[in-house]
């Protein structure tokens, strides 16, 4: 009887282990392309510095997640769409891009890249932000 229970236990263990291995699959993600420019980053350099750190001799490339949010009560543009990283405003979609999304509630989190922020003996570069989206439709 003990041999039957032992064999039965081994069979169950084998089934569990083979199912576990079948569930594991390799997911190959294509790299994110940061092609979508935003505007207004110059006004938010202090916030970008808090996120990316102080300027260094070479440009920085910091991958982050950004929140893209409608801002219908914006005093300057009722269609404004704000970009936040770590809860800090870092810029906006351009007026033309925001106008294309007018009337839609936008609240998405997307990959983003903070780039620039160099300081050397000859020049200094501001931080910029690019979103990892291919089109505005990804925000709807």
Tell me what each language-model feature is.
Residues 2-140:
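Conserved active-site motif detector
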């Amino acid at each position: 009887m003990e041999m039957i229970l032992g064999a039965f236990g081994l069979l169950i263990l084998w089934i569990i282990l083979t199912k576990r291995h079948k569930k594991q699959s390799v997911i190959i993600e294509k790299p994110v392309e940061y092609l979508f420019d935003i505007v207004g980053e110059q006004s938010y350099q202090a916030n970008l510095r808090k996120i990316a750190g102080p300027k260094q001799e070479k440009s920085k490339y910091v991958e982050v997640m950004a929140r893209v949010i409608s801002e219908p009560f914006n005093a300057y543009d009722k269609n404004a769409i704000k970009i936040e990283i770590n809860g800090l405003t870092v810029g906006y979609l351009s007026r033309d891009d925001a106008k294309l999304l007018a009337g839609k509630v936008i609240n998405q989190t997307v990959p983003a890249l903070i780039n620039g922020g160099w300081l050397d003996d000859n020049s200094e570069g501001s931080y910029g932000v690019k979103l990892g989206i291919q089109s505005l439709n990804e925000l709807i």
